[in-house]
Amino acid sequence: MRKSFYTWLMTERNPKSNSPKAILADLAFEESAFPKHTDDFDEVSRFLEEHASFSFNLGDFDSIWQEYLEH
């Protein structure tokens, strides 16, 4: 079974980094409503588009998701 996207993303937290992956990790950590137990692209993408209290480049998200799948 694959780790949830959130669990994987938390391994990428680095407040000193300007990489999109580290930025998303820090934003997701601060967002209490972020879907923490899913590995479903549509669920996470929909959350980022419609419910997140922050904005994030969805093109960067697509690249990060691809990296998650390859991990």
Swiss-Prot record:
It comes from the Bacteria. Disulfide bonds: none annotated. InterPro entries: UPF0346, YozE_SAM-like, YozE_SAM-like_sf. It holds the Pfam family YozE_SAM_like. Coiled coil: none annotated. Belongs to the UPF0346 family. HAMAP family: UPF0346. NCBIfam families: PRK13672.1 (NF010193). This is UPF0346 protein SP_0947. It comes from Streptococcus pneumoniae serotype 4 (strain ATCC BAA-334 / TIGR4).
